Amino acid sequence: MPITKEEKQKVIQEFARFPGDTGSTEVQVALLTLRINRLSEHLKVHKKDHHSHRGLLMMVGQRRRLLRYLQREDPERYRALIEKLGIRG
């Protein structure tokens, strides 16, 4: 199931650093995490959907790069973000 406009706005509002912020690293990572979680659920049902699996791997790689950047530039924001998202177990 695709992400609705309302769900996307909710995530943006929750992770925005200031009003109108849609492109900060935190927002990008949060949106990618939402998409990754949705696609993971899809792949549990449709195990042979290799095309979507490749898309999942690409999204995970993009999120990894963004998180690496954030950790390098501002470790405190990085730690707060991973705790809020519940990733990096």
UniProtKB/Swiss-Prot annotation:
Gene3D superfamilies: 6.10.250.3130, S15/NS1, RNA-binding. One of the primary rRNA binding proteins, it binds directly to 16S rRNA where it helps nucleate assembly of the platform of the 30S subunit by binding and bridging several RNA helices of the 16S rRNA. It comes from Thermus thermophilus (strain ATCC 27634 / DSM 579 / HB8). One of its GO terms (molecular function) is rRNA binding. Keywords: Ribonucleoprotein, Ribosomal protein, RNA-binding, rRNA-binding. It comes from the Bacteria. Belongs to the universal ribosomal protein uS15 family. This is Small ribosomal subunit protein uS15. GO terms for cellular component: cytosolic small ribosomal subunit. Signal peptide: none annotated. Part of the 30S ribosomal subunit. Forms a bridge to the 50S subunit in the 70S ribosome, contacting the 23S rRNA. InterPro entries: Ribosomal_uS15, Ribosomal_uS15_bac-type, uS15_NS1_RNA-bd_sf. SUPFAM superfamilies: S15/NS1 RNA-binding domain. GO terms for biological process: translation. PANTHER family: RIBOSOMAL PROTEIN S15, BACTERIAL AND ORGANELLAR, SMALL RIBOSOMAL SUBUNIT PROTEIN US15M.
